[in-house]
C-alpha cells in the first residue's frame, strides 16, 4: 500500500484535518476517507524517500502513530470488535516495527488484557499520555472519541515541532555555505597566495598571515581536528544523557537568549494541550499532573508540575499552586483560575494552549525574518574579510611595482 498526505473536512466537527492515509490508489484513499466521515479536499502521494529511514531503522514516526490511531478510532466507532479492528490496522501499516507491536497487542487483548495495559508494554510507540487516554476511554466507554482526541493532539504537536525545525532550516543552510566558502578559500586560494609571496620573498599582512597559518594547521592536522570533533561529540552526547546533563540542557533551553521565549511557550502549550485532552476524557487532576510532568519533556518544567501536584494533593487550587513557579508563564495559572471558577478547567487549558500555539507560530515567522538578514551580513563579513586578506598583499605588490 502507498501512503497519501491528505487534507479533509471532518463532517462531524466541520474542522479541517491534515494527516496520512494508506491505500492502493488515490481513488481508494478518497473512498476510505469518505467512509471514515471526511470530505477529502486534497490528496497527495507521499514521497517514499521521507519514510525510507523510518522503514529500515524500525523507528515509529509520529505519522505512523497518527494513522494507526485514526484508523483504529474509525473502526471501533463503526462497531467492529477490538481484535478485528487491530488486525485491520495492522494489515494497512507499512512500518515493520509497528506491525510487530500491533501483533503483540492483539495477542495480549485476545489473552484477556485491556487495551491500555497492552499499549503500556510498548513505551517506544505509546507514551504515558496515550495509555492514560486509552484507559480513560475504556472506563467511560468512549474509546473512539479518546483515540480521535489523541490523534488530534499528536497532529498539533507534530505540526508545532515541524514549524520549529523549518525555521531553523534556512540558518543551517547559510551556515553550511559559510563553512564551504571558508574551506574553499583556506584550502584552494590561500595556498596559491602563499606560494606567490614565498617566491617573491615579500612580507605578508597580518590578516593574510593568520589565514595562511590556519590553512596550514588544518591541512597538516585535519585528521586530528576530525578525531577531536568525533570524540568531543561522543562525550558530549553521553554527558547529555546523564541526569546532570539533562538538567543543564533543559535549563539552557529555558534561559538561552532569543530562543527562551519560544521554548517556554512551547512547553506551556504542551502542558496545557495535554492537560486539556486528559481532563476532557475524565482523567483525575492528580493523574493529569503526573502524566503531563512526563509529557512536557523538560525536567525543570516537570519538577514545577510535580511541586504543584503536591500542593494540590494538600488541598490547594491548581492555579495557586502554579502561580509561584518561575518558569510557568503568568497566563497559565490565570486561565486555570477562570476554569476553576467556571468548572471548565479543561476548556480553559485548551484555550491557553491555542493562544500559545498561535503566538509560537508568529514568533517562529518573526525569528525566520530576523535571522535571514543577520546571517547574510555575517556571511558578507566573513567572505569580505577573507577576500581582503587575499587582495591586500596583491595591492601591496602592485604598489611596490608602480613605485619602482
Q: Whereabouts are the PLM-identified features?
A:
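Bilayer-spanning, highly hydrophobic alpha-helical transmembrane segments
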Residues: 159-238, 358-404
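Membrane interface segments of multi-pass transport proteins and intramembrane proteases
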Residues: 195-206, 217, 243-261
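Alpha-helical membrane-embedding segments
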Residues: 224-244, 278-295
Amino acid at each position: 500500500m502507498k501512503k497519501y498526505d491528505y487534507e479533509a473536512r471532518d463532517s462531524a466537527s466541520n474542522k479541517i484535518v491534515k494527516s496520512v492515509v494508506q491505500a492502493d490508489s488515490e481513488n481508494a484513499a478518497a473512498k476510505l476517507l469518505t467512509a471514515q466521515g471526511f470530505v477529502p479536499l486534497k490528496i497527495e502521494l507521499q514521497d517514499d524517500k521521507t519514510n525510507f529511514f523510518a522503514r529500515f531503522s524500525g523507528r515509529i514516526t509520529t505519522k505512523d502513530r497518527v494513522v494507526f490511531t485514526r484508523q483504529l478510532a474509525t473502526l471501533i466507532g463503526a462497531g467492529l470488535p477490538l481484535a478485528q479492528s487491530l488486525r485491520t490496522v495492522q494489515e494497512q501499516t507499512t512500518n515493520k516495527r509497528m506491525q510487530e507491536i500491533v501483533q503483540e497487542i492483539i495477542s495480549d487483548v485476545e489473552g484477556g488484557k485491556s487495551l491500555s495495559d497492552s499499549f503500556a508494554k510498548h513505551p517506544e510507540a505509546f507514551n504515558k499520555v496515550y495509555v492514560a487516554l486509552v484507559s480513560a476511554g475504556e472506563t467511560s466507554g468512549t474509546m473512539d472519541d479518546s483515540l480521535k482526541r489523541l490523534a488530534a493532539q499528536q497532529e498539533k504537536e507534530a505540526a508545532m515541532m515541524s514549524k520549529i525545525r523549518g525555521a531553523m532550516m534556512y540558518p543551517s543552510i547559510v551556515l553550511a555555505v559559510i563553512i564551504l566558502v571558508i574551506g574553499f578559500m583556506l584550502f584552494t586560494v590561500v595556498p596559491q597566495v602563499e606560494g606567490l609571496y614565498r617566491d617573491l620573498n615579500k612580507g605578508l599582512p597580518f590578516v593574510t598571515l593568520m589565514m595562511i597559518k590556519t590553512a596550514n594547521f588544518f591541512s597538516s592536522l585535519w585528521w586530528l581536528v576530525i578525531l577531536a570533533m568525533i570524540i568531543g561529540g561522543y562525550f558530549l552526547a553521553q554527558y547529555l544523557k546523564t541526569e546532570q546533563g539533562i538538567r543543564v540542557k533543559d535549563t539552557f533551553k529555558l534561559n538561552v537568549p532569543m530562543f527562551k521565549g519560544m521554548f517556554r511557550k512551547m512547553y506551556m502549550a504542551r502542558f496545557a494541550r495535554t492537560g486539556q485532552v486528559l481532563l476532557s476524557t475524565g482523567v483525575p487532576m492528580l493523574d493529569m499532573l503526573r502524566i503531563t510532568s512526563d509529557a512536557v519533556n523538560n525536567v525543570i518544567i516537570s519538577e514545577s508540575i510535580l511541586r504543584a501536584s503536591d500542593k494540590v494533593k494538600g488541598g490547594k487550587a491548581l492555579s495557586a499552586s502554579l502561580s509561584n513557579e518561575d518558569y510557568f508563564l503568568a497566563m497559565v495559572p490565570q486561565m486555570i483560575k477562570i476554569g476553576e471558577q467556571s468548572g471548565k478547567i479543561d476548556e480553559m487549558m485548551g484555550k491557553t494552549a491555542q493562544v500559545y500555539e498561535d503566538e509560537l507560530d508568529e514568533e517562529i515567522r518573526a525569528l525566520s525574518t530576523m535571522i535571514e538578514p543577520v546571517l547574510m551580513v555575517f556571511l558578507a563579513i566573513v567572505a569580505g574579510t577573507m577576500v581582503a586578506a587575499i587582495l591586500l598583499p596583491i595591492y601591496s605588490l602592485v604598489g611596490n611595482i608602480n613605485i619602482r
